[in-house]
């Protein structure tokens, strides 16, 4: 079977890579990205769209078997690979280090993220001059959804609801701005960027949960993405207004989102974090993607 590399064409390849990620999740969960992360990245206004054409795709006679790409900018690179093609690892790493370098705090070069369970990939990375940087690793935790779902608790006067009940982009913008520790009120000229994030093709308003304060403001938010073709779901993002933390509101939003996914058949929820916030509600660390750094050759 022949193998060939070509460059990414967004109009042609965006949906094809979504399907590829869906297929390899079913074959080998969750070593590669889940499809919603690809979709969320492309809905985010911070993504560098000028250099998408530098993404590389490998294909066999039946379609895509590997992709090298960034999430938001050059220099922070991810590799998605069909487990049937381990022989492509060296070529894909070499491509990343040669063609996808960026200007970062560490200097000019690139980080490539590799699942720690893939020790062979790590050996190849080291042989090519990459160095592991644990301080930049990406943890992954999962929540195995129990048959008897835990009771969800809320303080008096607060409620949870979905964005299908009320879709107020300005309220979402405010809780996300404050929830990610930005002081004051959010810039009004960023509301349309927020709307774009909430308009991805597979975004589900009915699974995305907010906690509503007595004054009607959203004070906690949990985004939820079903993983196509599976019984998994992915949490992204979660934020709580700092004035309303340690009240159980974030936990209530996350659990209500998971509960709704479970009602549709989900059996596991994933989140890209190992924070105590998630572990305290029953998540367990299930994997880590190590960041491997290589400075650009002069």
Predicted regions and their residues:
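Short, high-confidence coil segments that cap the C-terminus of an alpha-helix
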Residues: 53, 105-107, 206, 266
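Conserved hydrophobic beta-strand within the GNAT/NAT acetyltransferase core sheet
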Residues: 110-113, 235, 268-273
